[in-house]
């Protein structure tokens, strides 16, 4: 009886929370650091492969939740460059699991009904041939899809991503294809993973599970440039619930509201400084001058 009551309360709370976040702005791009699979397994006396398998099940659910809520782009940190330091058995097991999930997505009619474009970001030269084959297969099959974008980071490191982009640009400058005057933020973005000219957009919200409060070298260019919101939560990845996702979006929305209030406050200060009588009717135009901090107005 107690469990049933809790379940009913949980469902009602989830519905209320979803209704609340749907009444405000939904982040276009969410990036997730899926941490805690191994600790989840360890607490239960199970193998690490069990933890990764349970985490993979949650990943499938999160993809569905994001699509249903209206998120346009989801980037998942599946395997970092540092993960190669793990045992050969664990690395091989992870690659086999990732390959299995790619093939499942390839054969799932929902991938095509929902027009999901799937791309991999990372150093593919470090991946086994069978995995690269599956990646190429699903990328080719979904390359024209535009409704929902799913990026999977494998053999990925943020610094490494920026370094390879700089090398590509330097080679283009050296060969005469580009001049130094052509190099700007937009050009660098276009040379980041997954491929030249096909960039991952700025991130609105980073979610990390497992209790650690750090972003682990994940999408530094796309995240820091947009000053994205971050949400750190205690549950291990296999324990991640829809409520946790909804709460993370609520944090993003609260941050957006705080920025709007700050901007309104700054506009009012400028109006008062310039004279309400003369400029009061121009508050809307003044608001378009923000961020005022960059213009020297505190």
UniProtKB/Swiss-Prot annotation:
A Pfam family per the record: Prenyltransf
Family matches, as Gene3D superfamilies: Decaprenyl diphosphate synthase-like
Keyword Amino-acid biosynthesis: no
Record-annotated membrane-spanning stretches: none
Keyword Magnesium: yes
Self-association state and partner proteins as the record states: Homodimer.
HAMAP family xref list: ISPT
Protein name as it appears in the record: Tritrans,polycis-undecaprenyl-diphosphate synthase (geranylgeranyl-diphosphate specific)
Chain's gene name: uppS
